[in-house]
Structures are given as structure tokens and as C-alpha cells.
Amino acid sequence: MYFLNRTFLKGYYIMKKLNRIKPLSRGHEITWWVCRALLFIWGVWGMLHGYTSEFVQATFAIIFTHLWDMFQLFGGRSFITKVPAYMQTLLNVFICFGCVVGTTLNTRTDFTGIDIPEHIFAGYLACTGAYVLSEIMQGEKQPIKISVQALFSLGFAVSILVGWEYYEFTMDRLYGFTMQHGQAPYSHGLTDTMVDLMLGTGGALAAMFIEAFRRVGIIGGKDRHEKRAAYLAQRAEVKKEKMRLKALEEQSGEIK
């Protein structure tokens, strides 16, 4: 009884330390639950028709659709709690499309072209997420240069794409899957890997330029001119500060 009471109290204190989940807009919430429902139906349908791996895949996919919620609950005071909800929406749509549409076409039809939009969008999504993460980690008081942000986001996206190919290679070797469309003695699997990386990198490059131009106000919606003015004002401040430091260095040199 003492052990149960102690366990209950520990659980209570842990729950009190968890953050509250921020309120969501109705559009995000509906999109998330539609994606989860489709994944659940797809997984159960696959299991009933002999595709047990699809049910396992759907289970893990549904868990990943709750990433934002887990960030909010367990993130404490770290930057991860500041990730915007629309990133989870993009991820959920991608996961749902990749599983329900992509996997179904790959396992039940001879159509193999679904990998092309999947990998392009994966690269775009990874690069866009890297832009958001770089801004959050840097903080509002220390704005990051757009060129540095672009290079970081591209490198981050390519790293994610390479990590996914490691995953595909491992699953094929351990469980006999054909995620890379080839077995060890043949070169077709290597070709598929390289094509996937090139497609994903293409999507990441597109996101790198689009997000950079959007953040400096070259393209965008109604707030484009405001962003452009803020960016130019920031550049002017940086230039002014550099000139001030240069003048101080020259003065100190003359004194010496």
C-alpha cells in the first residue's frame, strides 16, 4: 500500500510539472484528426487483409502526428515548445499521404512514380522546419543573417534525407523489406537511394530560396512590405554598428 501511494504521489508531481498544451486553431485541429483517422483506418484495413506491417507503420505514424503535443507537454522551458503548430500540420499531411497513398501504391500496384513528389516534399518540409528552428534557437533579440539561416537549413534538410536513407537501408537488411527497391548484390538499390537524395535535395533547395525571399519581403502575402522594411532597417542598424566599431578602432589606433 505504501508503494502504491508513493507511486501515485510521484505520478501526481510529474503531471504537475508538465506544460499545458497551447490552444489550436480549428483548421489545424481538424486536419490533424482527419490525418490520424485515415492512418488508423488504413492500418486496420491492411491488418485485416494480411498486411501486418502496415498496421505497425500506421501505429508509429499516428505517434509522430502527436509530436507537437509532446513538445508542448515535455518541453519544459526549452525552445522546442515554441515550434509553431503549422509545422505539425505539414508533417501530418506528409505522413498521411506517404502512408495511405504512397505505401498503398507501392505494395499493391506497379506504379513507382509516387516516390518523386514524396521526396521533393520531404526535402521542402525539412528545410522549412530548419528555418523555423534556427529562428527559435537564435531568439528574437539576436536576429540571424538570412544567408547563414539558408545554409543551415539546407544542411539540416540534407542530413534528414541522408538519415532516412540509412533507415531504409537498415530496414531492408534486417527485415527483408524492399524500401530501396533492391537487394545487396544489385546496384538498383543504390540508384534508388541516390535518386531519392537528389529529389529531396531539390526540394530543400527550393525551400531554401523561397523561405529566404519570404523572410526578407521579396515574396509573400499582405505583410511582404512590412517584412521588407524591417529587414532593410535591420541591415541599416548592422551597418551603422559596424561603422561605429570601425571608428572606435581607428581612434584607438591613433591614440597608440
Language-model segment annotations:
Residues 2, 7-185, 194, 201-256:
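Bulky hydrophobic segments
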